[in-house]
Structure formats: structure tokens, C-alpha cells
């Protein structure tokens, strides 16, 4: 599910759905149709979004009151903190149209084959997070720009900036990071479809139990 709605904090104008999310999701659905059955449900401004029933949720600009717990959640341009998110919003940092480069805080599969230092932002949301829940992957001047949580309670990625105020959508890093996110949060149940007798293989369980 892709939900985009909200107003620009500076101008008060309605923010339109981001074409970059729409395009990269459509491209991934087409390119990896044999690997993932990606069916995109876009919820328009003014319509009611769902908080259950999807494998992957994208909320842009307007955040849900409570995080969905039955799928992966991407919060893009976070402006308010969902109740059960472990996040706190400390305001907007505006660079007055000056762009700054981000830095990688750690290695993570989501950043695989990317060069994070190519990414710039000119405005972002200052976020305080619970370090026991989240890992900061990208930052600027100590402020987190991309946070990830992946545990039994929740699977969440938080982009603390809007794609409208970043060069990320114009870089190869954007589709790579979206692909890596799917690989990281929703790995294949099994790799391969033909095995020899006594050959060992791994089954990835996405639920609480796995029966074979």
C-alpha cells in the first residue's frame, strides 16, 4: 500500500503523491515479477488508508497514528511520530536551499551496491529515536536520515527527509535501496527449487511458526 498526503510545513500547500515512488515500485513489479508478486494499492489524499492486510506499507508526508504490525513499514518524510514507533519529532531543519551530503553510519544490506555519500538533502525532520529499537544507516551532522528497525515486533524504515528536498530520486541509489529493502525485510522463503538427496538448505520463516 502506498499512501501519500499532507501539506508542506513552509508553504501550507498540498503535497502531491511522489511520482518517483510510483515509478520505482512499478519498475520493480515488472522486473521481478518472477520473484515477487508486487501488486500496488495507491490510496489517494482524502481516502482512508489501511493499517493491516498488506505486506509492505509506504506512508509519505502523513503518518499513521499507529504503526501497522503485520507488514514492513516505510515512513517517508516523517512529520509526526506514530504512537508505537519509538520515535520523537524535534522539528524541521531547513538549509535554505543549500544541499548537504549524507554519511553512512554503518554497513547494512539496504545500502548494498550504493554510494550513500552521493545523496544530498536540503531539508529534513530532526528525529530522536530509541537506539535499542533502531539503527541509523545514514546521517548528517549527527542527525539520523535513514533509520531501520528489524525485529520480531516491527519491521520499519524511516526516511527523515522528503524526496522533494533530495537528489536521491535522480540517483541509481534510489531503486537499489528500494530493491535492497525488499530483499532485507522480505527475503525469499527458499533459494532454489531443485535439491539433491541429503543436501542442506534454509527456509526463511516470515511468521511465528514454520511447518514442513
Protein language model regions, located:
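N-linked glycosylation sequons
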Residues: 1-212
